[in-house]
């Protein structure tokens, strides 16, 4: 019986070492060698202070900053540990109430006209760091007024921060909120 069991145990042990230890170490080593910033989470630092990650959204509540799309991570917005969608269906009263509250907050901040969909809808992960260029544009007047800047200058920052489709085909144009807000804080020449 042990003769029949030995090959299975050896194979299980060998595959555990290969797939559980060898492969992850190999991929980590290759990633660290070829793209260390991305392998370490695309972290953004100001000097030695960690500001955030280009890959995970964070909450900006000040009038002086562009606001992200709503987070679906529960009572603590942009909590990466609680990453998930809200799982609320399109007919859910809770979803309708949340979207209405988000739109009301935007209206109270002086944003008029048509509100882009991503201003009221969370992403699938609840942590998307991007907003649509349209959502950024409807916030330009609010941010410019709060900072005492000309709208044209803030509009130019939005243009520079807008990323196009991948290979010109995949996805939608998007603006990384953290990068845009850091550009707002950068010294002007």
From Swiss-Prot:
It comes from the Bacteria. One of its GO terms (molecular function) is ATP binding. GO terms for cellular component: plasma membrane. The chain crosses the membrane at residues 7-27. It is a single-pass membrane protein. Keywords: ATP-binding, Cell inner membrane, Cell membrane, Ion transport, Membrane, Nucleotide-binding, Plasmid, Potassium, Potassium transport, Transmembrane, Transmembrane helix, Transport. The keyword Transmembrane helix applies. The keyword Transport applies. It is found in: Cell inner membrane. InterPro entries: KdpC. Belongs to the KdpC family. Part of the high-affinity ATP-driven potassium transport (or Kdp) system, which catalyzes the hydrolysis of ATP coupled with the electrogenic transport of potassium into the cytoplasm. This subunit acts as a catalytic chaperone that increases the ATP-binding affinity of the ATP-hydrolyzing subunit KdpB by the formation of a transient KdpB/KdpC/ATP ternary complex. The system is composed of three essential subunits: KdpA, KdpB and KdpC. This is Potassium-transporting ATPase KdpC subunit. It comes from Rhizobium meliloti (strain 1021).
